[in-house]
Amino acid sequence: MTTNKDVECLVEPTSNISITEENKNVTSETTTTTNNTQNKETETTDNINKEETADKENKEEQQQEENPENLIKHPLQNRWSLWYDYQSGKINPEHWVDSLKKVISFDSVEDFWCVFNNLPNVSNLKQGSSYHLFKDDIEPKWEHESNKRGGKWFVMVKDKSRCDNQWLQSVMACVGETFDSSDEICGIVYNSRKNGDKISVWTKTAQDEKATRDVGNCLKKILEIDQTIQYTPHEDFIRSSKGSKNLYEC
């Protein structure tokens, strides 16, 4: 390989050329060194900025976690439990509870939304399926102590495109205690059936006509319907599997 010294020997009469070559090499090395230094400085600055951003985000997250307001949940007046059942064929009144399963319970606004934001919509329920949302100490059974002297308002779902919103609105009215005579409310049920879906609100005291009618009228407002709805007592179902007569209408 030809070195700078070799160049000097070969071109002694015109030594200025060798000086120029050396200057070029020095300039090139200086430029390369300068660029490397600038790149390192830029890389260092970027790393510092990233670390500062990460530290800031970590501090903000820590402050949010330490903020007591972020840890406070808004309690509901009652604790509620969600149940599910599926009937593959004709419902046998004596054995239908065998498929009834308790899914989850909640007692705060935050937990309510956590449950319902992850719950399949009623419009997607398989035919034969039902959701039951009841106060935690009440099982969704006719013969339960809180239900056996009561009954239910039931509404046939005529517009399937509205069923998800109607179900959600009626559920929120239950857990939010916005029904008139809300103390009478035991729970609410959504049935997906071949012959038509149905929303039912269960109450405690069938013979309390005023309180029962208050619930029925409020349900119609919540669902935004003008159709006539019926109320049937559980007592008739308990006595006979043939069903019961409507006690009230509104």
UniProtKB/Swiss-Prot annotation:
The cross-references to InterPro entries, in alphabetical order and at most eight, read:
TIF_eIF4e-like, TIF_eIF_4E
One GO molecular function term?
A: translation initiation factor activity
Signal sequence range = none
Record's keyword annotation contains Protein biosynthesis: yes
* Low complexity bias spans: 25-39
Question: What residue spans carry the region label Disordered?
Answer: 1-72
Choose any GO biological process term that the UniProt entry carries and state it.
Answer: regulation of translation
| Residues that, per the record, bind mRNA | W96, V97, W142, E143, R193, K194, N195, G196, D197, K198, R239, S240, S241
* Domain of life according to the entry: Eukaryota
What the entry lists under Pfam families is as follows: IF4E (PF01652)
Positions with biased composition (Basic and acidic residues): 40-62
Q: What does this protein do?
A: Recognizes and binds the 7-methylguanosine-containing mRNA cap during an early step in the initiation of protein synthesis and facilitates ribosome binding by inducing the unwinding of the mRNAs secondary structures.
Record's subunit section = eIF4F is a multi-subunit complex, the composition of which varies with external and internal environmental conditions. It is composed of at least eif4a, eif4e and eif4g.
Q: What name has this protein been given in UniProt? A: Eukaryotic translation initiation factor 4E
Q: Which organism is it from?
A: Dictyostelium discoideum
